[in-house]
Amino acid sequence: MAFIESSSGKQPSLFSAIAIGVGCIVGSGWLFASYKASKFAGPVAIGSWVIGALLALMIALLLAEIATFYSKETGLFARLLTITHNGDFGFINASSNWFATIITIPAEAEASIQYLAQAFPKISNSVFNNDHFTHLGIAVVCLLMVFYGFLNYWGIKLLAKANNTITVFKLTVPALTAIIFMAASFHPENFSSYHGTIAPYGYDKMFTAVVTCGIFYSFYGFSMITVFSKELKNPQRNIPLALAGSVLICLVIYLMLQISFIGAIEPSEIIGGWHTLDFTSPLAQLAIILGINWIAVVLYVDA
């Protein structure tokens, strides 16, 4: 990667390592997860993000222990469980990770098309209708996946050089969105108005939402820091800090988004319950409802 092999020959710093982790974590999940979690669990979804982050942090710290011990190992990420367990277990896990990576690509493409479809109302129903992609929508998603492939094949050096800048942008947009939502409209009563409790559907939903609403998925990607463990400056110090730091930074952003989303909804919209919410491009549509059209444009561009 170009940000590893800099012209000055310097090894990437802790900031660059955190940027790698944050850049890999922040994807399409934040565009939908706060809405899906609110709809499924109600305001108690805030706790779901903390649980998801703790699970990711546990895995991150275990990964850090191995990565620092084998920091000079070539291809550590691919051989991680072969080193810690055995070749058979490592093969099974590596295959599972490969399938997960394959699934991530169309998931990101679907998220992009679902958001962008709402920016063009005249063709929206032709691409995405009744919470499902049409045949045309699936074809557009496939074309976008091909574009992603060419972008990564030919543009990887350019993107790698700009990794830190891209990461700052990826953090700025959700953070700015959360702050603007809080400033534009915040209804504290939303946190307990339905059934008079923060957990109208039960506290068990707080745990279920971690898996079913894309919360843990939104933290997926921090492990990519270990791919560059051999090139990092002072890996024994920087790998644990980068892994933990990237997860915690993203947790703060996600909590801001979740709290701002819950607070920004008009109380009249949830009289019948959080499960009655119906958005296809949640944050962008909410921005339009609040009259913050420029944020909606930024969200569409970011998508």
Enumerate the language-model features and the residues they cover.
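Short, Lys/Arg-rich, polar N-terminal cytosolic tail immediately upstream
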Residues: 1-11
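Extracellular loop-to-transmembrane helix junctions
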Residues: 9, 32-137, 246-249, 256, ...
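Membrane-interface loop-to-helix entry segments
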Residues: 116, 136-188, 220, 243-248
